[in-house]
């Protein structure tokens, strides 16, 4: 197994560990939103780790970015649910906020790494 694949595997395991830990620290009502937000963050983080070089700084950035999924789920779950469309709106906001936040985080990390 090459060193890059080992770093990639380590990063994915750490990201999944952050998801499991966050699931138990999230409130009972926010767990579905947390899992949705974590899934979006996980997909973006794995894609960024695969495309970019899997160095220690990028692994730290991915873990930091994955930790933000808890904040996104709290924000999305705090929106009121009055009609059936509001539930779809909360899911849409959760997906979009997770994607944008993760993208901005990776842009910032990439900018720090390239100088």
UniProtKB/Swiss-Prot annotation:
Keywords: Cell membrane, Conjugation, Membrane, Plasmid, Transmembrane, Transmembrane helix. One of its GO terms (cellular component) is plasma membrane. The keyword Metal-binding does not apply. It is a multi-pass membrane protein. NCBIfam families: PRK13712.1. It comes from the Bacteria. The chain crosses the membrane at residues 5-25, 39-59, 60-80, 91-111. This is Protein TrbA. It comes from Escherichia coli (strain K12). It is found in: Cell membrane. InterPro entries: Conjugal_tfr_repressor_TrbA. Its main location: membrane.
């Amino acid at each position: 197994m090459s060193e890059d694949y080992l770093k990639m595997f380590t990063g994915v395991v750490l990201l999944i560990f952050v998801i499991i830990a966050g699931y138990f620290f999230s409130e009972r009502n926010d767990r579905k939103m947390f899992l949705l937000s974590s899934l979006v963050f996980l997909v973006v983080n794995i894609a960024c780790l695969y495309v970019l070089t899997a160095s220690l700084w990028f692994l730290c950035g991915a873990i930091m970015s994955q930790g933000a999924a808890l904040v996104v789920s709290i924000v999305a779950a705090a929106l009121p649910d009055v009609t059936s469309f509001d539930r779809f709106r909360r899911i849409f906001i959760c997906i979009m906020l997770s994607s944008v936040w993760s993208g901005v985080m990776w842009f910032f990390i990439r900018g720090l790494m390239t100088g």
